[in-house]
């Protein structure tokens, strides 16, 4: 596949960025499964600083509005593929992934209230708030139709009663989004 001039220029831009950060290592440890552990011999920064650097340069959260901590650009699948390809060719870590970024942020952008978007999207994208998902239950597994955990609105707060198991990345998370019966 040969790209047109706009995408050839963009590819060179991404390659230059990757070269600048080649061998990046994280100052906050490498025991987090939500992204690459980084490399060695290159610059050093925290995962949160790296997330912000990627966003500021348009290499992560490209179509998330700036007001919620994203880059604020148009969705462009070809540019996204170029970014993924060039990062995978280099010794430059990509962004953190995880349940919050991959599942919660798109849901909040589509269905969340303004308050929810303001409270959760930016810190999630910036790696300051790590999420796990609470779907599986002891007698239901991941059969969501069989969920037993209940959510009840008491005053202005939701009270959750039930159990969740197999909660991916729970040991790294500050927050959990879960499915409950209401």
Q: Which residues does each PLM region occupy?
A:
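A short core secondary-structure module
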Residues: 157, 161-182
């Amino acid at each position: 596949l040969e790209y047109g001039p706009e995408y050839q220029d963009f590819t060179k831009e991404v390659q230059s960025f990757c070269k600048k950060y080649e061998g990046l290592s994280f100052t906050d440890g490498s025991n987090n499964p939500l992204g690459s552990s980084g490399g060695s011999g290159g610059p050093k920064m925290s995962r949160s600083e790296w997330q912000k650097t990627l966003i500021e340069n348009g290499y992560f959260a490209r179509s998330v509005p700036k007001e919620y901590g994203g880059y604020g650009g148009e969705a462009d699948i070809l540019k996204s593929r170029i970014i993924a390809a060039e990062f995978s060719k280099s010794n430059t870590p990509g962004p953190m992934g995880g349940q919050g970024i991959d599942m919660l942020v798109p849901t909040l952008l589509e269905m969340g209230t303004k308050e929810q978007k303001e409270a959760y999207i930016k810190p999630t994208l910036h790696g300051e708030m790590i999420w796990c998902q609470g779907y599986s239950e002891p007698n239901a597994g991941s059969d969501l139709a069989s969920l037993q955990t209940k959510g009840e609105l008491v005053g202005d707060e939701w009270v959750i009663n039930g159990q969740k198991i197999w909660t991916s990345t729970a040991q790294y998370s500050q927050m959990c989004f879960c499915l409950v019966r209401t």
